[in-house]
From Swiss-Prot:
Gene Ontology terms: cellular component: mitochondrial inner membrane; proton-transporting ATP synthase complex
Protein name per the record: ATP synthase F(0) complex subunit a
Topology versus the membrane: Multi-pass membrane protein
Signal as UniProt keyword: no
Length: 227
C-alpha cells in the first residue's frame, strides 16, 4: 500500500484509541524520581544544571514580578524540547507537528500575558498600540496595524513551530526514500545521499532544540511587555 509523505504526521491509533496522550506522557519517564538526596546520580546533576541554565536564560529579560512564571515557562520548554527530540526517533509520532496542539499551547499563554498587562498596568499595555510621536493623520492606521500585529502573535507562535518541524521531517522522509530507491541503481549516489541524511538529522536535532527555545523565549518577551 502506498502511503503519503504526510501520513507520518497523523496521530497513530491502537485498537481505535489515539496514542497522542501516551506520547505526551512518555517524556516524564526521562526525569529522575524524587529521593532522599538532593542529587542522586550524574544524570540528575546534568538535568539540574540544564534546568538551571534554561531558567536563567528565560528570566533574564523579566523583572521580579515575572519570576513567578519561571516554573511554568521552564516546564513548557522542557516538555517541548523532549517531545521534539523524541519525535526524531524512528517509528515515533511528534505531537508538535500538529497545529492544533501548538495553538492550544500558544493561545492561552499569550492571552495570559495580555490579561496580566491589562490588569497590572492597563495604560501602558494600551499605549503599545500607538507608537510615541506618531503623526495625527496616521494614528487610526497605526492603531489598526498594531492591533493586528498583537492578535496574530499566537498564530505566529503556533505556525512557526509547526512549519519548522514539519519541513524538517518531510526533508528527512524524502532524502531517506531517495537513498533507499537509489541503492540498487546507483550505490555511490546512495551512499552520498545517506551522508546528507546524517547531516540533515544533526541539523534537525538543532532545529528541534532551537524551536523549543524560541517558542518559550517569545512568550517571555511578550510577558516582559506586560509586567
Amino acid at each position: 500500500m502506498n502511503l503519503s509523505f504526510f501520513d507520518q504526521f497523523s496521530s497513530p491509533h491502537l485498537l481505535g484509541h489515539p496514542l497522542i496522550l501516551l506520547s505526551l506522557l512518555l517524556p516524564a519517564l526521562l526525569f529522575p524520581s524524587p529521593g532522599n538526596r538532593w542529587i542522586n546520580n550524574r544524570l540528575s546533576t546534568i538535568q539540574l544544571w540544564l534546568l538551571h541554565l534554561i531558567t536563567k536564560q528565560l528570566m533574564i529579560p523579566l523583572n521580579k514580578n515575572g519570576h513567578k512564571w519561571a516554573l511554568m515557562l521552564t516546564s513548557l520548554m522542557t516538555m517541548l524540547l523532549t517531545i521534539n527530540l523524541l519525535g526524531l526517533l524512528p517509528y515515533t509520532f511528534t505531537p508538535t507537528t500538529q497545529l492544533s496542539m501548538n495553538m492550544a499551547l500558544a493561545f492561552p499563554l499569550w492571552l495570559a500575558t495580555l490579561l496580566t498587562g491589562l490588569r497590572n498596568k492597563p495604560s501602558a499595555s494600551l499605549a503599545h498600540l500607538l507608537p510615541e510621536g506618531t503623526p495625527t493623520p496616521l494614528i487610526p492606521a497605526l492603531i489598526l496595524i498594531e492591533t493586528t500585529s498583537l492578535l496574530i502573535r499566537p498564530l505566529a507562535l503556533g505556525v512557526r513551530l509547526t512549519a519548522n518541524l514539519t519541513a524538517g521531517h518531510l526533508l528527512i522522509q524524502l532524502i531517506s526514500t531517495a537513498s533507499i530507491a537509489l541503492k540498487p541503481i546507483l550505490p555511490t549516489v546512495s551512499i552520498l545521499t545517506m551522508a546528507i541524511l546524517l547531516l540533515l538529522t544533526i541539523l534537525e536535532v538543532a532545529v528541534a532544540m532551537i524551536q523549543a527555545y524560541v517558542f518559550v523565549l517569545l512568550l517571555s518577551l511578550y510577558l516582559q511587555e506586560n509586567i
